[in-house]
């Protein structure tokens, strides 16, 4: 009996010791797990608009880790719709017309972040479903070294010249917002409207003969490598290439005109890390968050974040006068129909 009792006691002591060790082991890992706060963003590509610096600053200042994500606006919305019953993302970054679609599809929810009142009325949804964080002007991002001695194109008409065969790229306008923005820009510049996309469709049909390159996602690196010598893209990508990557590039605002468009963010409906998502949205509108956009050559929605040093690197105001505003609600309304028409013309 005594032996059995002492044996039982020994087993209990060993069990207690193991339990204590297990608790200590778990305890050692608990702070690390707790410290690793996360928020999931759809369409936050590190190569686009210097999201790499913004995501790093978010982690440094808030402790929230936001993984980068290479979806475009259309792909992000498709994923949000597919995951509607069990959302994965917390926040989403979209071209403005895509934000109208996201609201219509019920995949985003209202949130009015810090500095809400600093955002101009036309650059936010009145209920808070989306709000602009910065804007860009569409034009030609040109790698001059890849032009093989040809002149830098200055107009939409120039891009149709046979000498630029195989040199012109644009993102797919049936999927990527920047692609659709390019289509709207050429359409408006050539006399079209949201009720008449014939000028743009005719232009794309003519461009087809020049064998354009049509990626679905951000193509910054492909311009720098010379694979795509001329890309329909925003000013901020060209300025980044010129001033940060020291590439021999030029940004051109076409002679016939172009458009400037905002990019926006939203809180995802049913966000699994909603509190963290809100902190991310607060940060991108903070003084520091907005300054990162300005230093990446975007126009921050809070204009006072634009430094004199950054502003001096933009083309003159006389060039930007050719960039016209458009009705973003109409732009959103016509996006799907244009995408379908475009696919018919190009395939």
Please place each PLM-identified region on the residue numbering.
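Periplasmic-binding protein-like
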Residues: 50, 118-121, 136, 166-175, 201-206, 212-213, 283-307, ...
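C-terminal capping/gating helix-and-loop segments adjacent to ligand/active sites or protein-protein/ligand interfaces
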Residues: 290-347
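A ligand-binding cleft/hinge motif common to bilobed small-molecule-binding domains
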Residues: 97-103, 224, 229-248
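A bilobed periplasmic-binding-protein/Venus flytrap-type ligand-binding module shared by bacterial periplasmic
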Residues: 139-146, 184-189, 261-274, 284, ...
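Short beta-strand->loop
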Residues: 108-117, 130-131, 157-160, 229-230, ...
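Extracytoplasmic ligand-binding site segments that recognize negatively charged/polar headgroups
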Residues: 44-52, 75, 88-227
